[in-house]
Amino acid sequence: MCIRDRLVRGISLEINQGEIVTLIGPNGSGKTTTAKMILNILNTDEGLVTGKARKMAYVPQKINIDWTMPLRVIDFMKITNSLNNTQITESLSMTGVDELLYNQIHSLSGGEFQRVLIARAIAKKPDLLVLDEPVQGVDFNGEIALYNLIKEISVNLNCGILLISHDMHFVMSTTDHVICLNGHICCSGSPSNVVKNPEYIKLFGQHNSETLSYYQHHHDHSHNHDGSISK
């Protein structure tokens, strides 16, 4: 007899145009699985994935690249993606790295590479953009700049964004709606309400709740794509 555990169950969520919804939870809680079901990469055992999103784009948590292989940004953008040069330059410009068009992929910093990945995903102007841990390998200032970029994309493209992140401080200042998963939805709502929820506190601790309740990144400056500050 084969017994299969369900990775996630009872998941119900809604992502509207121009809205950022963030999935949080411990490792193995079903965040990436949920995202892949929404993208129809994985099939559901029960229930339906419905919506009006005609075009969906995905930036996975990990991407396998042979960093020793000569590969320019413009060529990387075209791999398994039928993009014309106008789409490529426009999307790279939107993510602030259009000057890197002919640079080698292996020469990019962590933040620059993430911006190229996001540019590749938004080149065809998706209705829904799914970002799985989009700031991996990026320093603190770069993280701030990337989360600001994600917010700009949601506004400028009026697309829904499903974000998976462990960076709680940035989640609290960037997202519109938080869903806390641990195999099922433990709690959901606005960031300020979720951090006070008993289920959230049970998972992440009272100190975390008090620290994050309610963090926002206030400033009178902007961040460049490398994380540096411009007045």
Regions found by a protein language model. Give the residues of each.
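Catalytic Walker B motif of ABC-type/P-loop ATPase nucleotide-binding domains
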Residues: 129-133
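Conserved ABC ATPase signature
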Residues: 104-108, 112
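Conserved ABC ATPase "signature" region
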Residues: 85-100
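ABC ATPase nucleotide-binding domains
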Residues: 203-231
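H-loop (His-switch) and adjacent beta-strand-loop-beta switch element
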Residues: 178-190
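Conserved catalytic motifs of ABC-family nucleotide-binding domains
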Residues: 125
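H-loop/switch region of ABC-family ATPase nucleotide-binding domains
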Residues: 165-166
